[in-house]
Amino acid sequence: MKMPPVLCCIVFLFVSMLSAVPRQQEKPRVIVTTDGEIDDQSSMIRFLMYSSDYDVAGIVQVNGVQKDGHSKDKWIESQIAKYAECLPNLRKHNPDYPDAEYLLSVLAVGNENREDLHKLPPLLSDSEGAQLIIRTLLDSDPRPVHILAWGGANTQANALWQIKQKYSAAEWAKAVSKARLYCIWYQDGGGKWIEQNLPEIIIYESGAPDHDGDMYGIT
């Protein structure tokens, strides 16, 4: 049966209206790894301010060049406590800000000592941070996991090496399909090790400072 012209117009307008309705964008899933040096402490403030825009799967403290282990300073816990004070006001603008208790529950320590700057798999010891990355890459959530290396990438290298060595080929394939590594230059040997030994992993390097202190992008 041929549809009347008026009915055709109504159907067309209805479909057009549906297509014009904005779809809720899926939040990117993020694990941030940080060395706790002063630039990262500043970045963490901004990270928390924008935490309504992404799904925080983990915050992992990793190695830096200035001293052994910033985790003992409890600087992230202090920042999250301040975030909790601001949370009621933040949620007036966006209800999607995560609970402070949740952020503390996904906080872990990775390979954070300066000596780990010079170690590579399989010489790195296991860590809570590596296990958090492993659990996230192997869980049932199919979304990509954007692992942001503000400091070194040895903890990420350690986690990926463990998955490839200790888990099934199917689980390794799942990890490969989900992992998205972003490195703010290779601050230890981990990023280059992943690039050379696990070429199937998607990895981006942002660049390194030149002698004038400027940043050049090599992504």
Each model region followed by its residue ranges:
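Hydrophobic h-region of N-terminal signal peptides that target proteins for export
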Residues: V11-A20
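Bacterial N-terminal signal peptides that target proteins for export
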Residues: M1-C8
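N-terminal acidic, glycine/proline-rich low-complexity segments
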Residues: V21-T219
